[in-house]
Curated annotation (Swiss-Prot):
UniProt KW keywords: Virulence
Gene (name only): PPE26
Record bears the keyword Protein biosynthesis: no
UniProt KW Ribonucleoprotein keyword: no
Identification of the protein by name: PPE family protein PPE26
Function, in words: Probably plays a key role in regulating innate and adaptive immune responses through human Toll-like receptor 2 (TLR2). Interacts with TLR2, leading to the subsequent activation of the mitogen-activated protein kinase (MAPK) and nuclear factor kappa B (NF-kappa-B) signaling pathways. Stimulates macrophage activation by augmenting pro-inflammatory cytokine production (TNF-alpha, IL-6 and IL-12p40) and the expression of cell surface molecules (CD80, CD86, MHC class I and II). Also participates in adaptive immunity by directing Th1-polarised immune responses.
InterPro entries the UniProt entry points to: PPE_C (IPR022171), PPE_dom (IPR000030), PPE_sf (IPR038332)
Source organism, top-level taxon: Bacteria
Coiled-coil positions: none
Length: 393
């Protein structure tokens, strides 16, 4: 199209009759919003994939996922840049229109020029309006040239503004053949599971049937040999009574072995009771008591022979301070009320307490070794210190 061949009425009417630059401004705003959304999505994708593949999800599957998503993230970043470029070009097109609109002659001026020319021509009877008609024609020519120049400039600016990079198709991040491969794998797994279930259902009765017979019925296995050595039969017992019968020899052996110490102690007790009954033990006790009395008669002479005074002894009497009984270390020497041991202490037989029951292996344990447990120093021992009572002086 040659804008120079069109009269100014056409060019001016076209510029003033259209929607103006509002659609291009709206398009620029929309492209800006799309660019921002694509950029935000690309940044979010990259952040999430990086955190997921480096912290929460590791391994070959994570690496494959990150490698597959990387081209798509790059495409979104490129698309965001292209959308920003489109917004810039749309703003440039709107600016070009505004410039062309400002340079275009308004249609009312062109219409006024044409009306003035027609009036001058109609009244030019004697040629008196020739100069005015020429001036009107010259003004119209200038309007034509101005509109043509504005349209040529607008066409050039629009051509530059429309030069945008075309958008590319987003990459395919999923394997097109993966769905078929997955379906085949699922079918194979289902077939394997079905065959396994069939084998299990078929083999279950056989396994249960094998439990109805003794486990060691065969005499060739190593367990059969072991059972033969222990119990003299290669067959495993099929009932509790048969098992107890096989274990009877071992039970008797363990019972006799465990009861052997009790048998020895019982025999010893029987011998002691028999000796008491026959008087072998009771007749020796008076002789021992008499011998002890004879030995005690020589105690007074022992003190004189050693150069000391007569031996004094007291039994069952504590030292006293006033009417209070005190330890011997508080009162010094024994009081004069204690008679010297001129005569031996009377010795008499002391009968033992009657035996409540015959002795056994599980009698009292000897505690003689525990007598000195508190005498020596002990680690971590904290002695108890008692305050001196007021009556002690």
């Amino acid at each position: 199209m040659d804008f120079g061949a069109l009269p100014p009425e056409v060019n001016s009417v076209r510029m003033y009759a259209g929607p103006g630059s509002a659609p291009m401004v709206a398009a620029a705003s929309a492209w800006n919003g799309l660019a921002a959304e694509l950029s935000s999505a690309a940044t979010g994708y990259e952040t999430v994939i990086t955190q997921l593949s480096s912290e929460g999800w590791l391994g070959p599957a994570s690496a494959a996922m990150a490698e597959a998503v990387a081209p798509y993230v790059a495409w979104m970043s490129a698309a965001a840049a292209q959308a920003e470029q489109a917004a810039t070009q749309a703003r440039a097109a709107a600016a070009a229109f505004e410039a062309a609109f400002a340079a275009t002659v308004p249609p009312p001026l062109i219409a006024a020029n044409r009306a003035s020319l027609m009036q001058l021509i109609s009244t030019n009877v004697f040629g008196q309006n020739t100069s005015a008609i020429a001036a009107a024609e010259a003004q119209y020519g200038e309007m034509w040239a101005q509109d043509s120049a504005a349209m040529y400039a607008y066409a050039g600016s629009s051509a530059s503004a429309s030069a945008v990079t075309p958008f590319s198709t987003p990459p395919q991040i999923a394997n097109p053949t993966a769905q078929g491969t997955q379906a085949a794998a699922v079918a194979t797994a289902a077939g394997t599971a079905q065959s396994t279930l069939t084998e299990m259902i078929t083999g279950l009765p056989n396994a249960l049937q094998s439990l109805t017979s003794p486990l060691l019925q065969s005499s060739n296995g190593p367990l059969s040999w072991l059972w033969q050595i222990l119990f003299g039969t290669p067959n495993f017992p099929t009932s509790i009574s048969a098992l107890l019968t096989d274990l009877q020899p071992y039970a008797s052996f363990f019972y006799n072995t465990e009861g052997l110490p009790y048998f020895s102690i019982g025999m010893g007790n029987n011998f002691i009771q028999s000796a008491k009954t026959l008087g072998l033990i009771g007749s020796a006790a008076p002789a021992a008591v008499a011998a002890a009395g004879d030995a005690a008669k020589g105690l007074p002479g022992l003190g004189g022979m050693l150069g000391g005074g007569p031996v004094a002894a007291g039994l069952g009497n504590a030292a006293s301070v006033g009417k209070l009984s005190v330890p011997p270390v508080w009162s010094g020497p024994l009081p004069g009320s204690v008679t010297p041991g001129a005569a031996p202490l009377p010795v008499s037989t002391v009968s033992a307490a009657p035996e409540a029951a015959p002795g056994s292996l599980l009698g009292g344990l000897p505690l003689a070794g525990a007598g000195g447990a508190g005498a020596g120093p002990r680690y971590g021992f904290r002695p108890t210190v008692m305050a001196r009572p007021p009556f002690a002086g």
